[in-house]
Amino acid sequence: MTKTEICNLALSLLSANTATDIDTDTTPQAEAVRRWFAPARDECLASHPWNFATKRARLTLTWTALSGVALADNGSGEIRVTHTSHGLTTGQRIHMQDVEGVTAANGTWYVTRIDADTYDLDASVFAGTHTSGTGEWIVAPLHGWDYKHTLPTDNLRVVRVNGYEGNEEDSAPYAIEESVLLSDDTIIDLQYVYQHTTVANWTQDFINAFAALLASYVAAEITESVGRGETLRKQFEAIVAPQKRRNDARTGKGRTLQPTFNSQLVAARRSSITNW
């Protein structure tokens, strides 16, 4: 179906006059549909892990090399890093790795900014002589997680993170905050719903849901009936709800607490296996 045909489905749900070309028609209903088309499209895509709008990406971290950087004693026994235009502020948290000579620098640190070119690793202990050119660092989440990954610019909904084929619950633990993905993994194999704008490839079940959602947003403007918009919203939710019940709609997954070997749960499982 074309964009105009899809928009006309939405207009027909409102018993409104349809458009000849939704991108150029100047009728009030065409202008209303154009205004709401993209917001409704993205909301509908994000409402469910639609197969036609799901793709994969691998997210990796970009580390900053410590080339041309000096590590020394700050005069109080802590490690001071001299790195031109480091860009850090006091209280930020960083990971440092592969440092040779001053191996105590390897780890996770909160930093204190001295000036634009130097910072201290809080509560570190300086020892040794830095081997020039070794080591790298990266900014870490402030607490709770080890790494933060930039999501693809076309991401609308994360489906699976470092998971196995099958149920969404197979995903590794993660959280999404401020458009970044927080994880304890350095590499993320991501499956996500993207901003699919090629209407010719949309599936009919998605088109049906989208038409109802789009109509719900323009109903009050076109029909002057708030109630009609609410009814169409419920119609959209009824189309999507069965899929939602079969899929986890959260934008994160918490860590799983493993039961101890002597827990009642483990004991019950061992008993069941023994008595099989």
Where are these predicted regions, by residue range?
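Glycine-enriched, solvent-exposed interface loops adjoining structured elements
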Residues: M1-S67, R93, I138-W276
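Small/polar beta-strand repeat architecture
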Residues: A65-L142
